Amino acid sequence: MVDMKASMFLTFAGLVLLFVVCYASESEEKEFPKEMLSSIFAVDNDFKQEERDCAGYMRECKEKLCCSGYVCSSRWKWCVLPAPWRR
């Protein structure tokens, strides 16, 4: 009877551990597209032309406001062209 209790406890603990690992893996996968796109469109400091008071196309808009003609994407936090349904 003791062996059955121990095996049930180990099985339950294994399932909980599997759930935690799968959840952590899934949450990392959700961040992957953002990280990949950020690295693709990242601008090196050597290629920056000048500092502006506003952020241009595909620039981060966390601290700065976007230049005229662009809006800050709520999902990606970049300055993008406004979609027709947002005007």
Swiss-Prot record:
Keywords: Disulfide bond, Ion channel impairing toxin, Knottin, Secreted, Signal, Toxin
Family: Belongs to the neurotoxin 10 (Hwtx-1) family. 51 (Hntx-8) subfamily. Hntx-8 sub-subfamily.
Disulfide bridge positions per record: C54-C67, C61-C72, C66-C79
Domain notes: The presence of a 'disulfide through disulfide knot' structurally defines this protein as a knottin.
Organism encoding this protein: Cyriopagopus hainanus (Chinese bird spider)
Signal peptide segment: 1-24
GO molecular function: ion channel inhibitor activity; toxin activity
GO CC terms, sorted: extracellular region
UniProt-annotated location(s): Secreted
UniProt function note: Ion channel inhibitor.
Tissue: Expressed by the venom gland.
UniProt key word Zinc-finger: no
UniProt cross-references to SUPFAM superfamilies, sorted A to Z: omega toxin-like (SSF57059)
Main location: secreted
Pfam families from the UniProt entry: Toxin_12
Protein name: U3-theraphotoxin-Hhn1a 9
Propeptide span(s): 25-52
